Design a protein with these regions (language model features):
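Nucleotide-activated sugar donor-binding and catalytic core shared by glycosyltransferases
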Residues: 1-49, 53-55, 59-177
Length: 177
């Protein structure tokens, strides 16, 4: 199945930023959440590109509870997996606090800025596909500026993408006739 989410949102490849934020340490902390939203607002203003933010229900609830404005961001409902994967694969940069998204962007060759102070995916830092920016608005903006020069030439630490084919070959070769 092919997704046309870019067409539906009127987006061009590499001409938007994608954001996810759902971790309690970010969304339940008013200071951190405000810092993240301020950083994203600064990114949108400086680059004049859409900042697509599919808002996790937890994050949406906190934004409303805390009375924090949208700051010019394109807040959307969460997307299905195929739509989100399409958005990830064509983004200029993904800003996230999700461990899984850090892995996905690394495999897809898309730069990632992690809005946390540490990560359980250090291999993404080691290969250069990801940087840690925390929840500081200035660091978020500086990270986006720095990724303008990134080239997706890092080595994928998660394998070569042909594990399924290898498994089928082994199963077929060992199957009784």
């Amino acid at each position: 199945k092919k997704s046309d989410i870019l067409g539906e949102l009127d987006l061009e490849p590499r001409e938007y930023f994608l954001v996810t934020a759902h971790r309690p340490e970010n969304v339940d902390n008013r200071t951190r959440l405000k810092g993240i939203l301020k950083g994203l607002e600064r990114v949108q203003k400086e680059f004049s590109l859409p900042v697509i933010f599919p808002v996790h229900p937890r994050t949406e609830k906190r934004i409303k509870e805390l009375g924090i404005g949208e700051n010019g961001l394109n807040l959307t409902k969460p997307f299905g997996f195929l739509e989100f994967l399409q958005l990830e694969s064509q983004a200029r940069l993904v800003l996230t606090d999700s461990g899984g998204v850090q892995e996905e962007t690394c495999v897809l060759g898309v730069p990632c800025a992690t809005m946390r102070y540490d990560t359980e995916r250090p291999e993404t830092l080691d290969v250069g596909s990801n940087i840690l920016v925390g929840a500081d608005s200035q660091k978020i903006l500086e990270a986006v500026r720095s990724t303008e020069s990134w080239k997706p030439d890092w080595k994928n630490p998660y394998g070569d993408g042909i594990a399924g084919k290898m498994i089928i070959m082994v199963c077929a070769a060992t199957r009784p006739q």
